[in-house]
Curated annotation (Swiss-Prot):
Consists of at least 3 heavy chains (alpha, beta and gamma), 2 intermediate chains and 8 light chains. Its main location: other. It is found in: Cell projection, Cilium, Flagellum; Cytoplasm, Cytoskeleton, Flagellum axoneme. Gene3D superfamilies: Glutaredoxin (3.40.30.10). The lineage of its organism: Eukaryota, Viridiplantae, Chlorophyta, core chlorophytes, Chlorophyceae. InterPro entries: Thioredoxin-like_sf, Thioredoxin_CS, Thioredoxin_domain, TXND_domain-containing. It comes from Chlamydomonas reinhardtii (Chlamydomonas smithii). This is Dynein 16 kDa light chain, flagellar outer arm. The keyword S-adenosyl-L-methionine does not apply. Disulfide bonds join C37-C40.
Length: 156
């Protein structure tokens, strides 16, 4: 493998990191695994091949999340203690597919059909996770809805 290539998968260790990744553009393949099992190794060659075929590295990200350490996704909490991985495919912050187990053909088909050619085709204003994150940040800064709307108008 050539030097300088991005990793195939990113390990997500915090709920904040997961939220930030899902609030972005492009397809995010989130593997939920049990702590005692670890991430699924059988799907890595498929993920590597698909990832290397993409020109825009932001159009597709593979993420691994330990079910026992994740509180951000209700689905992750429900998956605790299970032996098979669960794959959740998010496009522009919206759940598009759910694949249980290491079903490589189904993963391959779904990833290829859902991955945009370029992440810029997604609109963050249509990403519910992005909008929720921005709202929480606005509230944390003590801004009102009126302040946020005024700031938006000033940018145009």
């Amino acid at each position: 493998m050539a030097a300088g290539l991005p990793p195939v998968q990113y390990s997500i260790d915090t709920d904040a990191d997961l939220e930030t990744r899902l609030a972005g553009k492009g397809l995010k393949v989130v593997e939920i695994f049990s702590e005692w099992c670890g991430p699924c190794k059988s799907v890595l060659p498929t993920f590597r091949r698909i990832r290397l075929d993409k020109d825009d590295e932001n159009a597709l990200l593979f993420l691994t999340v330990c079910a026992e350490k994740c509180n951000f996704l209700e689905t992750a909490k429900e998956h605790r203690g299970k032996s098979e991985p669960l794959f959740l495919l998010y496009r522009n912050g919206q759940l598009k597919a759910r694949i249980e187990g290491a079903n490589t053909p189904a993963l391959n088909q779904q990833v290829l059909s859902l991955t945009p050619a370029n992440a810029d085709v997604d609109d963050l204003e249509e990403n519910p996770m992005y909008l929720a994150k921005m709202e929480r940040e606005r509230i944390a800064r003590g801004e009102t809805v009126k302040d946020a709307k005024g700031a938006k108008k000033g940018k145009k």
